[in-house]
């Protein structure tokens, strides 16, 4: 049986507000996800806009490769979701 994959992308969250010693937000569910899941502390966005950045993430390519310049996600062949489907995951 394959492990579940839960992909959570948080837009406009400040790490200092919901984690660490200076935490000022009450986020029990995010706290639980971070404790029991895989947490990446050093992720870097591919672009300054949400849609362009998500498009880069889902296609595993930088924006200049995908040609994304608008507010629409365009999935190329062999994208993140295709890879999951090809490996038996249900999307």
Enumerate the language-model features and the residues they cover.
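Generic alpha-helix structural propensity
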Residues: 25-28, 52-53, 75, 79
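Acidic, metal-coordinating catalytic cores used for nucleic-acid/nucleotide bond scission
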Residues: 47-49, 73
């Amino acid at each position: 049986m394959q492990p579940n994959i839960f992909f959570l992308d948080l837009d406009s969250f400040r790490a200092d507000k919901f984690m660490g010693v200076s935490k000022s937000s009450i986020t029990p569910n995010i706290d639980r996800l971070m404790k029991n899941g895989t947490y990446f502390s050093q992720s870097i966005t591919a672009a300054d806009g949400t849609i362009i950045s998500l498009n880069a993430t889902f296609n595993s390519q930088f924006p200049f490769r995908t040609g994304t310049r608008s507010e629409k996600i365009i999935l190329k062949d062999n994208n993140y979701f295709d890879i999951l489907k090809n490996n038996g995951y249900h999307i």
